[in-house]
Amino acid sequence: MRISVTNRCNFRCTYCMPETKNVDETLSLDEIYEVALAASKCGITKFKITGGEPLIRDGITDFIKRLYDIDSVKDITITTNGFYLCKYAEDLVEAGLSSVNISLDSLKKDRFLKITGVDALDDVMEG
């Protein structure tokens, strides 16, 4: 089950988000947890955490730990732009995250900047 925990993002990719748009979350992590709990009771065992950029959501690593407290949950993956991975990698491992998908738009700095609106390829690669 795909769970979008935020619409906010630190990038402004041409294919995803206009320059001025940065919508606040509409559901709390507690509310999202209740949805995940209900889904698990219907047989869902795998969750994919997405956004926007899920790593800018306060409390995301605790939320992942909490999802793993649901007995039937077997696998949690996160999709990220990679910018904050260095900052959160250890916490994500401790939370039990199964895997990480990184959206990498280009390995060329100028093209990366043009697509994402952010000069952050080095930060993403470090992550």
Model feature map: region roles:
Residues 1-76:
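Conserved alpha-helical substructure of the radical SAM core
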Residues 58-127:
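Conserved AdoMet/S-adenosylmethionine-binding subsite of the radical SAM
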